[in-house]
């Protein structure tokens, strides 16, 4: 999708800018706020463009539908002759003689109609001799029947009508002592067999019809037995993240040589070499790094190390750098951060970024871009922020785990 490509390119550019400005004072926070505001603006433009494009398409379709009815009004007069009235096209060819009164007043018309019936019977007999299957002949043989008493120019136009309409007797026109013989089109065609009779013999559907239909009450237990039991997934409910993180902006800005990133959607831990990302792992009970951190004081201080994120936090971070490391690296394994205040040594600002870790971050952030677009109308209703910090806080309050992961920079 274009959205996924745009999200990946946007995240890759932002990661490069943030990584190149990690040595500047306040550079990471600046580019983080720029990233959030830029993403929100682009998502809003994308949402509005798609919405207006859909509205424009609907309006064009409505205009086309309003212009089409005048062309369809004259279609029902296709079989009517030029000299016939418009209402004549709505009747069959044998119903245009004026009913029984017209036949009684015009003996010549009745005689012509009788001759037409005789010709029709002769034609049917010839077709029965020629073809042994008389099923489709009952309707096609009546096509050349013309209307008695109608103008001569109408016969050619009325012959185009379906033949089945010619077999209909005139309504309210009983035969009054005429020598008209009853119309016998031959043996009636066999009705089509019922679908239930062909269903057991049809090889295409052997199981759907041969087996007796189960009652409606028995279907839900079968479906319930085949489907696995639904386990309460805490990651699917937004209340899980609210309980795990008291405030939406509880992530601090840390510069370290090795950093661990936890994806809030999939709970996947990604380690960034020479990076800039750090996210709290101890607040969630389902995080795998809680059991691998330093025992004793490290785990005990995990609950008490939470604090609000405000603009002056970086200065406090600089003052508290001498307090010591609260986390310990497990021997022979990937380093995990048991607390948000954990520090790592050997920070090298001149090293190049790891391409594989950046691609992992791009895949993590690209997966949540659809959620950002879907919830964009809620964030567009808010007033414009005064600065970048308020923009980040409003984005965290209005959006979900995707921007929380962005604020981890």
Swiss-Prot record:
PANTHER family: IMMEDIATE EARLY RESPONSE GENE (PTHR15895). Coiled coil: none annotated. Pfam families: IER. The lineage of its organism: Eukaryota, Metazoa, Chordata, Craniata, Vertebrata. InterPro entries: IER. Residues 168-237, 312-335 are annotated as: Disordered. Belongs to the IER family. The gene is Ier5l. It comes from the Eukaryota. This is Immediate early response gene 5-like protein. Residues 313-324 have a biased composition (Acidic residues).
